[in-house]
């Protein structure tokens, strides 16, 4: 079995090659698997020359932006896909609606590719499942010891307190977050703990509708509705919008960033994250009991996490992009 990182994860066994979260056009490959709908993982939905496999939820979320491969195939949790002697099995990754980690089984060993990972119990998505494996390929977005998140309950309480403070100044709080994932969590925080109406940007509203289709109750008002205009005039609401979106040029709106990176920000920012923090990554690795750990998707943190794993956990580890590996070694 040969494992290689080059614009996505490639696993090859006896001439059958599959790719996970491809980031560019791929050749000589049987199938491309997509872990979830965020754009930095879902390039494969632009491809039409090979089958592209994901959850149905992922396909629906990606379709919001108009991207849809003609060769998409659905895959449900624990359903097995055979490609020669490779067997691929999806499990929940805990990140966003429909997100998967992929277990790849061969006669010579088991690989687990996490995609984006969250091991905490969310308000909407089930947490990631540790799977015993020989080779673990794990994301390192927050793969450095300084990233220790407070509990989601603590963060939610802080967000509510901040929102009431802003409203008390006769201004409107705006939470800026990823349109898929964190935005729905924010809306649920206010739905479950306040009577405050929540207005969502139209891009967030499109995502909300997909979540609702799969049975997740989210109460919101679309920003383009007449009702939203009335509620904004009353100054008793919060707004949820995508990150990096310019607000109207008046002083009535006060924005806060919602992201794990908030631990590094000054000003109004809240570390609500759909990724695992550093201790959670280590716990997940321990529970998977791998012989080798490859780190990815963390930039400089790939090496920081890999060195920590080797030194503190005694497991061979290095960044996935450094060199291909053949397993068994």
Which residues are covered by each model-predicted region?
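Short, aromatic/basic amphipathic alpha-helical patches
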Residues: 64-69, 189-190, 210-216, 303-314
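Gly/Ser/Thr-rich loops at beta-strand to alpha-helix junctions
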Residues: 95-97, 176-185, 297-303
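Short hydrophobic/aromatic-enriched beta-strand-loop microsegments
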Residues: 52-56, 70-76, 194-202, 313-322
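Hard-cation-handling environments
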Residues: 157-234
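His/Asp/Glu-rich metal-coordinating catalytic cores
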Residues: 1-27, 31-33, 37-174, 181, ...
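Short internal beta-strands
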Residues: 50-60, 137, 196-207, 293-297
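C-terminal regulatory/interaction regions
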Residues: 7, 215, 222-329
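Short, surface-exposed basic-aromatic patches at helix termini and helix-loop junctions that form
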Residues: 105, 129, 188-196, 308-315
């Amino acid at each position: 079995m040969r494992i290689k990182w080059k614009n996505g994860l490639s696993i090859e066994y006896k001439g059958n090659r599959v790719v996970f979260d491809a980031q560019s056009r791929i050749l000589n490959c049987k199938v491309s698997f997509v872990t979830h709908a965020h754009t930095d993982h879902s390039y494969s939905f632009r491809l039409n020359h090979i089958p592209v496999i994901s959850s149905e939820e992922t396909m629906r979320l990606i379709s919001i932006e108009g991207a849809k491969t003609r060769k998409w195939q659905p895959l449900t949790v624990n359903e097995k896909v055979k490609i020669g002697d490779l067997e691929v099995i999806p499990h929940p990754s805990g990140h966003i609606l429909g997100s998967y980690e992929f277990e790849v089984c061969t006669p010579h060993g088991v690989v687990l590719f996490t995609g984006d990972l969250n091991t905490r119990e969310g308000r909407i998505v089930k947490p990631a499942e540790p799977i015993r494996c020989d080779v673990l390929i794990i994301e390192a977005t927050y793969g450095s010891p300084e990233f220790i998140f407070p509990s989601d309950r603590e963060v939610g309480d802080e967000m509510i307190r901040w929102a009431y403070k802003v409203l008390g100044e006769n201004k409107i709080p705006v939470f800026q977050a990823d349109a898929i994932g964190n935005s729905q969590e924010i809306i649920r925080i206010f739905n479950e703990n306040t009577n405050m109406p929540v207005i969502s940007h139209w891009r967030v509203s499109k995502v909300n509708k997909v979540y609702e289709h799969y049975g997740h109750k989210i109460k919101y008002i679309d920003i383009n509705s007449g009702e939203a205009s009335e509620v904004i005039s009353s100054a008793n609401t919060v707004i949820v919008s995508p990150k990096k979106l310019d607000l109207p040029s008046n002083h009535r709106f006060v924005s806060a960033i919602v992201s794990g990176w908030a631990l590094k920000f000054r000003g109004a920012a809240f570390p609500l994250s759909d990724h695992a923090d550093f201790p959670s990554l280590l716990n997940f690795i321990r529970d998977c009991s791998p012989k080798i750990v490859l780190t990815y998707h963390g930039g400089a943190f790939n090496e920081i996490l890999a060195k920590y794993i080797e030194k503190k956990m005694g497991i061979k580890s290095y960044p996935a992009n450094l060199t291909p590996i053949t397993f068994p070694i």
